[in-house]
A protein has these predicted regions:
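Acidic, metal-coordinating catalytic segment for phosphate/diphosphate chemistry
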Residues: 2-29
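Conserved anchor residues at repeat-unit boundaries in beta-strand-based tandem repeats, strongest
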Residues: 160-168
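Short helix-capping/linker segments at secondary-structure and domain boundaries
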Residues: 148-160
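Active-site segment of metal-dependent pyrophosphate-handling enzymes
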Residues: 78-113, 127-129
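NUDIX/MutT-family hydrolases
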Residues: 106, 115-146, 167-185
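Conserved Nudix-box catalytic region and its N-terminal flanking loop in Nudix hydrolases
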Residues: 37-75, 89, 172-180, 186-198
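A cytosolic small-molecule/anion-sensing beta-strand core signal
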Residues: 34
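Conserved beta-strand and immediately adjacent loop positions that scaffold enzyme active sites
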Residues: 29, 37, 121
Length: 198
């Protein structure tokens, strides 16, 4: 596992279950909306294999979260996305595994040809028929809010923050966060490696 950047890491992220929580892995998810549908993938390998989700993956050194979102979408679907907006920060406090921090983006502009890859089988899904039973348990909590925000054409709402508590992949509890400031800038590149503080 690649450690995260010290220069961008908040000293303390407070969650209801850990006062000094720090993510070990940071990643992105992208939901491309087009003509009343959203692009989803069936994950064929790696973390979340067999589950349905948006394209996404781990944030790498020297790229911004926006660049990560674009790269992962291209790698997993063959589509180049543009005009991404960050809609949410998700904090996954895991009692029996790695700690994840996720950033959810929405795009409405894309180019290219939809292509299945070794990592993912992409498909379009009606916005009113999302297969939550084949997704992570938390997706049904935050994804409807993301999609609703993304379809508002007037003023853009601030990204929301939500905490989730898991034990070995089982969702135990969740809580929205009143703050709207994200823990990381979505436009700043990830810098030097960071050794996680205990």
């Amino acid at each position: 596992m690649t450690p995260i950047a010290q220069s961008a890491l908040p000293r303390i992220i407070r969650t209801p279950w850990q006062i000094r929580w720090q993510p070990e892995l940071i990643g992105t998810l992208v939901f491309l909306i087009h003509q009343g549908q959203v692009l989803l993938i069936e994950k064929l390998t790696g973390h979340g294999q067999g589950k349905i989700n948006g394209p996404g993956g781990k944030w790498e050194i020297n790229e911004s979260l926006l660049e990560c979102a674009r790269r992962e979408t291209l790698e997993e679907t063959g589509l180049a996305v543009d005009n991404l907006t960050c809609e949410a920060e998700l904090r996954f406090v895991e009692q029996a595994g790695p700690q994840w921090l996720g950033y959810v983006f929405v795009a409405k502009v894309f180019s290219g040809e939809l292509t299945q890859t070794q990592e993912a089988k992409p498909f379009w899904c009606d916005l009113g028929n999302i297969p939550y039973r084949f997704m992570w348990a938390d997706d049904a909590i935050w994804l409807p809010k993301v999609l609703k925000q993304a379809q508002q054409s007037s003023s853009r709402p601030q990204p929301f923050v939500h905490n989730f508590l898991f034990n070995d992949g089982e969702l135990l509890a969740h809580e929205p966060v009143s703050q709207t400031q994200l823990s990381f800038s979505v436009t700043q590149p990830r810098a030097a490696q960071f050794v996680r503080q205990s």
